[in-house]
Amino acid sequence: MAAHDDDMNRGIRPGRGSDDPSGQIAYLEQEIAVLRRKLADSPRHTRILEERIVELQTNLAGVSAQNERLANTLREARDQIVALKEEVDRLAQPPAGFGVFLTANEDGTADIFTGGRKLRVNVSPSVDLEELRRGQEVMLNEALNVVEAMEYESVGDIVTLKEILEDGERALVQGHTDEERVVRLAEPLLDITIRPGDALLLEPRSGYVYEVVPKSEVEELVLEEVPDIGYEQIGGLGNQIEMIRDAVELPYLYPDLFKEHELRPPKGVLLYGPPGCGKTLIAKAVANSLAKKVAEVTGQAQGKSFFLNIKGPELLNKYVGETERQIRLVFQRAREKASEGTPVIVFFDEMESLFRTRGSGVSSDVENTIVPQLLAEIDGVEGLQNVVVIGASNREDMIDPAILRPGRLDVKIKIERPDAEAAKDIFQKYLTERLPLHTDDLGEHGGSKATTVQSMIQTAVEHMYAESEENRFLEVTYANGDKEVLYFKDFNSGAMIENIVGRAKKMAIKDFLDKNQKGLRVSHLLQACVDEFKENEDLPNTTNPDDWARISGKKGERIVYIRTLITGKQGADTGRSIDTVANTGQYL
């Protein structure tokens, strides 16, 4: 259109020198018309251009977003390729091995043990050679160089320590099949005290032991503690307590006097007597008293002693040699404790169950090896101080004579059944003024608790020890035909007195709950005596009355017949024959 206008303009444009005004006017009018048309078309062109610009901007934004997405996709693809390459490289690497660090060398190398071989290898700069410890596990690369430090081994075999060798870095141990082996001590064991008998964790390939496993066979059979029982808590055994204190405490407290008089301290003490009369109680009080005496001598606030309470029947083992080994471990522990200057009591309760007379066995001859083992250990105590063996038994006639001879169990103390005076003393341990007493009983004695308690004890003891018709218990017939009537007092014990007081206390509690009458009464004690006697009516119910009589403290002529003289709770008939057996050695 512009070109057409230009042609038209050129066609109607007057010449340069034209003087025709009308022509010039026509030309100008045409110019004006053209300009007006151009002016009218200008907004439309502007709008078209603006729309085009917006369209181009929209296209540009879409292209930019697409370009960003492509860039992100490329980056993700690159990361995946890198990760896959690393995974491929990792999977293509040879496996890493493990070894045990032995020692570091001056040139920066290390000696290790791996694959059954001892090697000297290089150490990666990332590993601090000075931080590696004996027995520590290390990681190795394909060239068998140390590239990483690991932890100590935590699994392996259990072995028993026999002794530590002179260099302090090796030890002699024993495996479960009794084979002996020399092993190295890992760094953690060099800083702690280990003792023979401890269970250790062994890594068998490298020969290192790493830790003490909290499982010692001796601990399962030994109660290593100081009991809190004092002599003042034991009633009716004043003479026996004095004898055992002379045998146990004097040699420890006054060793110079014994040496001056050339007097050898006793190696052992045997406490024998019927059940429930205080044998175990005295043994526990010995350890407690020794601890207090140690404190007095040394000036310490609290003394220390050890009481190794051997659970005799649990010491027996069906495997040959196991019981003997356990006995050796027990005395090994005792020697170790005694070497520290601490008194040690090795207490064998129910001694006849372990150390029967050799040759008395029927189904086995285990005593033929157990007894010599104990004899060897007791004789070994001679060179040690502060170790005393105490045995307790109610069948001392079954213990091997070699154990009972002087020089082994030197002191033999019989723990008798309590008489009336001893029974009063025992009652006073359990029946005290601290207990609530019934107002009626207090009123009979002017409100005095002390007088009331003494009266209750006196009444109970008189009832227990009266040779009355109601206290008749047994009629025994001896082998020579003699007969004897035994009363309940003949079978009394400290344990029975404690049980009687316990019954009376329970009756007082029940009376308070039922009748709202608080306090212990003498009638409770008397009824408790009757109930206790009735519960013991089945005592002689055994196939061997002679063995039963020996355990109960009746020694002497052999008993062949027992007849009960008390009617049972269910009205059982009295007078039953009890047959004897030929072999009396296997009762226990």
Curated annotation (Swiss-Prot):
Locate the compositionally biased regions of type Basic and acidic residues: 1-10
What is any one of the record's Gene Ontology cellular component terms?
proteasome complex
Chain intervals for the UniProt region annotation (Docks into pockets in the proteasome alpha-ring):
587-588
Summarize the subunit comment.
Homohexamer. Assembles into a hexameric ring structure that caps the 20S proteasome core. Strongly interacts with the prokaryotic ubiquitin-like protein Pup through a hydrophobic interface; the interacting region of ARC lies in its N-terminal coiled-coil domain. There is one Pup binding site per ARC hexamer ring. Upon ATP-binding, the C-terminus of ARC interacts with the alpha-rings of the proteasome core, possibly by binding to the intersubunit pockets.
Question: Which family is annotated?
Answer: Belongs to the AAA ATPase family.
Entry's free-text remark on domains: Consists of three main regions, an N-terminal coiled-coil domain that binds to protein Pup and functions as a docking station, an interdomain involved in ARC hexamerization, and a C-terminal ATPase domain of the AAA type.
Among PANTHER family, the record links this protein to:
AAA-FAMILY ATPASE, PROTEASOME-ASSOCIATED ATPASE
Start and end residues of each stretch annotated as Disordered: 1-23
Q: Tell me, what is one Gene Ontology molecular-function annotation carried by this entry?
A: ATP binding
The record's listing under InterPro entries reads:
AAA+_ATPase (IPR003593), AAA_ATPase_domain (IPR050168), ATPase_AAA_core (IPR003959), ATPase_AAA_CS (IPR003960), NA-bd_OB-fold (IPR012340), P-loop_NTPase (IPR027417), Prot_ATP_ID_OB_2nd (IPR032501), Prot_ATP_ID_OB_N (IPR041626)
Q: Which residues form a coiled coil?
A: 47-94
Q: Which UniProt keywords apply?
A: ATP-binding, Chaperone, Coiled coil, Nucleotide-binding, Proteasome
HAMAP family named in the record: ARC_ATPase (MF_02112)
Enumerate the Gene Ontology biological process terms. Answer: modification-dependent protein catabolic process; proteasomal protein catabolic process
Encoding gene, per UniProt annotation: arc
What pathway annotation does it carry? Protein degradation; proteasomal Pup-dependent pathway
Where is ATP annotated to bind? Answer: 276-281
Q: What is this protein called?
A: Proteasome-associated ATPase
The function of this protein is: ATPase which is responsible for recognizing, binding, unfolding and translocation of pupylated proteins into the bacterial 20S proteasome core particle. May be essential for opening the gate of the 20S proteasome via an interaction with its C-terminus, thereby allowing substrate entry and access to the site of proteolysis. Thus, the C-termini of the proteasomal ATPase may function like a 'key in a lock' to induce gate opening and therefore regulate proteolysis.
Which Cys pairs are S-S linked?
Answer: none
